Amino acid sequence: MEDVQSHAPQIPLNIDRVGVRELRLPLLVRDRTRGTQQTVASVDLGVDLPSEFKGTHMSRFVEALEQWNDEISYQSVRRLLQDIRQRLEARRAYARFCFPYFISKAAPASGSPALVSYQCRLTGELDDAGQHFILEVDVPVMTVCPCSKAISNEGAHSQRAMVRMRLRMKAFSWLEDFIDIAEASGSSAVYTLLKREDEKYVTEHAFAHPTFVEDVVRNVAQRLSEHGQVEWFSVEVESMESIHNHNAFARIERHISDRS
């Protein structure tokens, strides 16, 4: 059969990345408590395409992913990227796994357990120069405004904020490490299940630890700098302001050797 993809294109331009998005598959992830956990991932795969080819071979991405079927790790994703490069005769290969990660968390007063989900992403790129991996973890926290607390006779405004961490690692680290860092950096962690005594505890704890979005991002950055396995990070905290018609955000990006 005719291979139309191999024809010359009308406009001979290199394409930086072409491929497939939102392939869904079961995924096995390492779990600090249980060893592993089963989740579901949405996967993007891509390669570069030289100017002399009209199109890439989309089916080969699916074939590579079907053959892969592995526990996610830097090593296993590297094998997938190598296979994609070979199958598509590409210089660069790209893969991105997006998945929810679940932790059973006990409510702070009653101890009632419930699963909390955290959105995670692992992105890998491979070319002749080497491999590059970025781990991303999104963690919701609660913040209480220090200014509102200081100037109000009763109460202060509070809201949920999202801590988004992008990390380049020296070696494997548990997802729980970074979830713990984020949850310790706001006014309070958030929970799926809270009884009345838990709501009382969370409210009082949060109001005893008011934090600006600037405080949260600095807290996270300091803890990431001290982690030991992180060589680069970008952390952004976005506060879904409860009394404003806008959100607030703060961001820090650092190589660990850069302390300023």
Curated annotation (Swiss-Prot):
Site-annotated residues for May be catalytically important: C145
UniProt key word Hydrolase: yes
Keyword annotations of the record: Hydrolase
Root EC class: hydrolase
Catalyzed reaction equations: GTP + H2O = 7,8-dihydroneopterin 3'-triphosphate + formate + H(+)
A biological process term (GO) from this entry: tetrahydrofolate biosynthetic process
The EC number(s) this enzyme carries: 3.5.4.16
A molecular function GO annotation: GTP cyclohydrolase I activity
Pathway the protein acts in: Cofactor biosynthesis; 7,8-dihydroneopterin triphosphate biosynthesis; 7,8-dihydroneopterin triphosphate from GTP: step 1/1
Superkingdom as given in the UniProt entry: Bacteria
Entry similarity comment: Belongs to the GTP cyclohydrolase IV family.
Task of the protein: Converts GTP to 7,8-dihydroneopterin triphosphate.
HAMAP family reported for this sequence: GTP_cyclohydrol_B
Annotated protein name in UniProt: GTP cyclohydrolase FolE2
Record organism: Desulfovibrio desulfuricans (strain ATCC 27774 / DSM 6949 / MB)
Primary gene name: folE2
